[in-house]
Amino acid sequence: MNLEDYQKAGVDIFDKLHLDSYPISIKYIRDLENEIPAGVRRPIDSGEKMSICQAFTYARRFKQKLCITSADNFCTPSSVGHGWVPLSVKEFTESQIRQKWSKDVQAEKRRAEHIYASNFKNVIELAYRGVIVSPLMETPVIPDSIMIYCDGPKLTYIINALNYEHKRKYRIQSTFEGFGESCSKGGFMPFVTRKAQIVIPGTGDRSFAGIQDHELGIGMPGSFIFYVLENLFQTGSGQGLKFPLRQLLPKLDENLTPGFRYMREVIDKKMNEAK
């Protein structure tokens, strides 16, 4: 697939699902001198700092094209988590202990063992130095990952599409922590693991990026968008899962409440008297 195919896919998924914001193209880069396309802005060049989740919001709501690096990013844990700076596991763990995200030192060490310690060195050795973020329909680069924010029913349609053939490649495998949800699970983990990830926006997303209470999300390897479009709305073969969502409506009568029932009796009496 070429760049135009991805841009068209961005338009198609936006239109078909009636999304409230644009799907996001995410591209990881190693060479800051040569891999940033014309028209892509670095916040630091205008004296700003910006987190990755904020860049996602600017891309999906305002169609901005941005490059975030360690120098641009005030959210230092995400710079470390993406391998942009060569901190040690010990140093990163100490920063998280000082943040008091976990109950105590032992809790944070258990978190490290479970979440990030085993792959810490591998991520740094990937040698990425930044990320290009843009609306998919106007992306200047072929994306490594695509992130879509949406409400619950629309997310269900995407999940149905990915699971339509139950192929191992497209299975969704997610864990949840409440931190680094959009930047990590929406972009970096799908790129590294080649697996789609459900995103429940976390602490930083809610605090920094203006994500609404009803919004959820999904991150996927870039090429998965074509599989989603191919299978969108196929699940159920018309049995209530088309768009907009078809929901069962209860069959009710006036016996639902005492007031309804009384009013029906009065109406019927008056109608009979008028005959």
What does each model-identified segment do?
Residues 4-275:
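Acidic, serine/proline-rich low-complexity intrinsically disordered regions
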